[in-house]
Amino acid sequence: MSKSLKKKSHWTSKVHESVIGRNPEGQLGFELKGGAENGQFPYLGEVKPGKVAYESGSKLVSEELLLEVNETPVAGLTIRDVLAVIKHCKDPLRLKCVKQGGIVDKDLRHYLNLRFQKGSVDHELQQIIRDNLYLRTVPCTTRPHKEGEVPGVDYIFITVEDFMELEKSGALLESGTYEDNYYGTPKPPAEPAPLLLNVTDQILPGATPSAEGKRKRNKSVTNMEKASIEPPEEEEEERPVVNGNGVVITPESSEHEDKSAGASGETPSQPYPAPVYSQPEELKDQMDDTKSTKPEENEDSDPLPDNWEMAYTEKGEVYFIDHNTKTTSWLDPRLAKKAKPAEECKENELPYGWEKIDDPIYGTYYVDHINRRTQFENPVLEAKRKLQQHNMPHTELGTKPLQAPGFREKPLFTRDASQLKGTFLSTTLKKSNMGFGFTIIGGDEPDEFLQVKSVIPDGPAAQDGKMETGDVIVYINEVCVLGHTHADVVKLFQSVPIGQSVNLVLCRGYPLPFDPEDPANSMVPPLAIMERPPPVMVNGRHNYETYLEYISRTSQSVPDITDRPPHSLHSMPADGQLDGTYPPPVHDDNVSVASSGATQAELMTLTIVKGAKGFGFTIADSPTGQRVKQILDIQGCPGLCEGDLIVEINQQNVQNLSHTEVVDILKDCPVGSETSLIIHRGGFFSPWKTPKPMVDRWENQGSPQTSLSAPAVPQSLPFPPALHRSSFPDSTEAFDPRKPDPYELYEKSRAIYESRQQVPPRTSFRMDSSGPDYKELDVHLRRMESGFGFRILGGDEPGQPILIGAVIAMGSADRDGRLHPGDELVYVDGIPVAGKTHRYVIDLMHHAARNGQVNLTVRRKVLCGGEPCPENGRSPGSVSTHHSSPRSDYATYANSNHAAPSNNASPPEGFASHSLQTSDVIIHRKENEGFGFVIISSLNRPESGATITVPHKIGRIIDGSPADRCAKLKVGDRILAVNGQSIINMPHADIVKLIKDAGLSVTLRIIPQEELNNPTSAPSSEKQSPMAQQHSPLAQQHSPLAQPSPATPNSPVAQPAPPQPLQLQGHENSYRSEVKARQDVKPDIRQPPFTDYRQPPLDYRQPPGGDYSQPSPLDYRQHSPDTRQYPLSDYRQPQDFDYFTVDMEKGAKGFGFSIRGGREYKMDLYVLRLAEDGPAIRNGRMRVGDQIIEINGESTRDMTHARAIELIKSGGRRVRLLLKRGTGQVPEYGMVPSSLSMCMKSDKHGSPYFYLLGHPKDTTNPTPGALPLPPPQACRK
């Protein structure tokens, strides 16, 4: 906010704070008097000597005005409400008081009728008082009643005589005229009326009276002309403030700012932040340097539109609040009616929505507030140049009425492709260095099409010649994107590597929602009129009139929707998350939808990274919980929509929490870390409850049933095409596996389930001696709020098995305990799924999610001796977090050997029968060195289409280390035991500790790599580090990052391998990526998020090219952030432990990040901190804990800290970093990276992580406004 520069001492300099607690009697030791019901500020009465428990601050003095209680402004509240605030505050209480005198005394009416400069502390305090008054009072007016207004709620309608009587009696705190009618603000009653009691009794500290349903300040009352009193001499000596644009804000404009919302013309009286009662002089001087949207000289001569309000930022910049849409904008809406096309503007004026910035560093540039972009070229000159250069055919733009850019009526939206009206066409585009050569618009709302905004000349789309402006994007590589968000589709396109192609299905016939020829709306030059080759013919047709006609003639670019339910159009890529949610748009795993359907209420899991200014969205209270009120940063909140109900935050249910408690939880989330949200969208939501009949059935059953009665199928024929089996052995129901109707079959399977509830549970299985033994289990799961709690793999091609992927910790499947990763899914609610596609299974789970339960039949290989598998599918000591593991390609289901686990060091039973040789390797080390090898532990994910085998293997051998010298250990060797103790089911951390305690020698029982007959599981170079592999041709061949991933499970990172049967699988052409350490992350706590939609708009007015935070969401001409991309089906952000490139431009005070580590400190280099509002945090990709792999193209392996600083400095104003996604936790000095647990002490690679050596070496790359982080060695030059 802008504050006046004062020559004399202002009353705010006398404000003091007292911190007190309740005394042993539970009392505060002072009386409270005054209150709005008496027309007074609340003030201190008798202060009882010796009864006040002071903790700090000054003493309380009788008769002083009470301004705040624990930062909650109380001026304008009744005594009852002030006491309620104090009652709900926990000790200690922080009271801000001021001595009466000058303009502030106990008389509210006197203070409210003073006239102050807009943006001053006094003006803000007046607004706070009015906000608080309207909690308890209703304005009165002499004007006639309007339609839709409720007497006694919107206004008290009285006669002129009654109004004059109230005025004479002193019952009005404010009064005046507006449009020849009298308006007044009566004193609130001491006890609230029943109408207002329920709403305002919930005022708690921190929950300012901004909840929906509170009293609102009326436009007429706010804008009424009052006989305002000039403030006394103390305030007359304040100098008017120049608002950064040369426009002096005069006191006469102070009262014309609040507008209304609702039938009666009212505005939600969101309270202003508590005034800052003291201000350093250096901050006061900053006001003259601010930049803002320049209001017209006569801006106050025209009223703002209804429900709009003018406000000021802390720097004095003008912005506008639209209470209709609950959004903020830098644009003055009054100027919209005066808008004209850019080409008609004079050279010394700018089009509507544009602003000129003169920056001392970057020079002059222009801000387009409509499209939120910046450019160096004058938009008027640009428009005139384009008009002449392109010979635009629609020159009649200048004859259009003067209005805001011509937005057209939004077409009727549909998620059903068959309902689209227009002609369909398909095209295939190959990604080039400039992207796909077109820009898109739309998708900012759930019911908005994504359309081609422009085609870039000479780009792939222009060269193809088929795409045109306005085309609706329907399918991208068989993924229907109708209803997808803009950010999702952008990420999908960005995930395609350069040189790869995508198939697009477009629908032509929908106009853009704006005039594409209007330069004010253009992100790129308008599409040039050019000769195009005739479109490619598909099956002899150029286009098709209807979508059904189109898909009936071609099946190459879109899936067949004729044999699936309509909702299957919303299918996602393979690998399903069967928890009833859509996949998180920015989460790291490629998962398919298994929600309740696009047209039904649905639960979604989103992952949002908190920035320096919060999460970028606001929340509001509602009868069903906290809902998303406004999206302030669309790019920062991908997948989130206004109106979404927040169900969980980081696995904590928040439905029954108050607004304040949810805000506090969001505040506690650290900056730069991922926060997981489960939100509910659509429908009327209440926590899921099982219907009574279902509860009765569950209770009658006693315990969950396990049916293991079906004959096992030999592995040589794992998926017989004619395999048929009913849901229960006694059932005679049959289903056609060729083309089942999921709806009909679901009803049948439900009837089967209900018919068997009287049958006692049975557990039996039969074995077929002709092949490996299997057993089938029936698993009944009830859907929790987070879903069924497991994921699905496979089914990418017909005939591939459908497998259970990761079992989510604390989910429904995990609590049930019977479902294991690697189980083959045979039936879903009695419907056979063997050989079916992934999408088909996901569709079945949609129906199950809607009904709250599912019956699954899974097939599991039987262990030797017929011993059952462990129930939990994980080792006991595993740590469970929700970071994601690296990508894993689906491995072909192949023949596998199997053996039972062993509890001792002897070879597991069954190894000899398969000619697998184990050997003992003894490694000796010296005192000053480590053993020199790295252990990699797999997670609880299926491998080769079955279970995880020996989960621990050698991932790296250090040159010259004891492990290297013994010449008996190779990369890829599986470790069975350490010093005679089996580690198959041991958590990774325990293995490290076991080796640590081994002393100077350790004995490893291993299965050599060559015995596994699995050459693809490890690189042939046995000493090549995983890190270095990324830069070698071999690594490009075998690296998970370089391979397409048709199916990707989402496994909790820290979860070690489950106690699965010991099986040695052969899996040709399968590429695995393994997690290499624990992920026990606990980042720092930082800044709170936004909770008020009236916050100023996000400042996107950075100089062009000055902030490479993210590629423009509307332009695909950006290079992919890293050439090692994932396949198209995986279009979310890089996953944990992925490699990615960050380019940054240096800010005024540096790059805004600090680093830790270096060779001299025996650790790799990591990102230590991100300075608030610095280039690094604005970039959005770098996070705390990321490992720095390269600096300006130079590898950081064995790099010293000083060399890293030198490289950053040598890059000048730009730096290019290759980073490896970390865990959010920075390793302590003397620790090896948390992503690698090394058993060594070599000089090159550091000491074991369990020793603490040396001192930290943290280097800061500061940014403006950030305190330097020690030591002050900054990357600034």
UniProtKB/Swiss-Prot annotation:
Residues 302-335, 348-381 form the WW domain. The keyword RNA-binding does not apply. One of its GO terms (cellular component) is slit diaphragm. It is found in: Cytoplasm; Late endosome; Synapse, Synaptosome; Cell membrane. Residues 17-101, 426-510, 605-683, 778-860, 920-1010, 1141-1223 form the PDZ domain. This is Membrane-associated guanylate kinase, WW and PDZ domain-containing protein 2. The modification Phosphoserine is found at residues 686, 884-885. It comes from Rattus norvegicus (Rat). Residues 205-308, 556-575, 869-913, 1011-1130 are annotated as: Disordered. The gene is Magi2.
